[in-house]
């Protein structure tokens, strides 16, 4: 994933930057295509930026989406400390992966399949770690392991994005810069470091402006 670094010095610029980033995120979410929104789990609003980025990936493979959403939707049980329910969800997620693994792998381009297999091994370990955290009723540990496991699932999902995928842009915007894909921006300010992801899959012109 390409990276760029920019520098701003004053607190006023830092405040304006935060406003720009908020607009970017809002614009990116508004411009997500209907199929991406359809993949979002129903019920509670999705607020985790990492989950939103996973859901916005343009690919068509329902099994790994279900795997992702099952883990993401453990938040309510975790807040209520319903450890028995959490244990059942993790076990069912593990069973789902075992039965759908080959189907998911077959959807990954052959050249990337070895990478996907290695990532699934990490997901396997992550699910084992989650079961241990459930047994220990370790809430902070469960959150950390879930975040890491979902990150590996997201990496597999990124491999499912069609090669050369580009969002169609009207011809009148041909002169504008655009980003097809995603980029991570590391931004240094007097208030500290900021890291943000700009999503060219769904808002290529907004992302290209950075």
PLM segments and residue spans:
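N-terminal secretory signal peptides that target proteins for export/translocation
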Residues: 1-14
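Sec-dependent N-terminal signal peptides
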Residues: 14-27
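Start-of-domain signal
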Residues: 18, 43-67, 73, 80-89, ...
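N-terminal signal peptide c-region/cleavage motif recognized by signal peptidases
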Residues: 33-34
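Boundary of Sec targeting at the N-terminus
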Residues: 39-40
């Amino acid at each position: 994933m390409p990276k760029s670094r920019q520098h701003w010095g004053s607190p006023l610029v830092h405040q304006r930057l935060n406003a720009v980033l908020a607009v970017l995120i809002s614009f990116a979410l508004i411009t997500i295509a209907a199929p991406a929104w359809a993949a979002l789990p129903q019920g509670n609003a999705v607020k985790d930026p990492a989950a939103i980025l996973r859901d916005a990936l343009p690919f068509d493979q329902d099994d790994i989406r279900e795997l992702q959403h099952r883990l993401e939707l453990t938040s309510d049980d975790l807040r209520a400390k319903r450890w028995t329910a959490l244990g059942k969800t993790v076990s069912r997620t593990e069973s789902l992966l075992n039965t759908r693994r080959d189907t998911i792998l077959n959807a990954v381009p052959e050249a990337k399949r070895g990478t996907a297999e290695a990532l699934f091994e990490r997901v396997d370990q992550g699910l084992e770690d989650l079961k241990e955290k459930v047994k220990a009723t370790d809430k902070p540990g469960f959150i950390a392991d879930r975040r890491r496991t979902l990150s590996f699932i997201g990496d597999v999902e990124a491999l499912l994005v069609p090669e050369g995928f580009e969002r169609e842009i009207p011809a009148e915007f041909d002169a504008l810069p655009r980003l097809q894909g995603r980029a991570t921006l590391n931004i240094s300010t007097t208030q500290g470091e900021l890291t943000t992801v700009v999503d060219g899959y769904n808002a290529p012109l907004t992302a290209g402006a950075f």
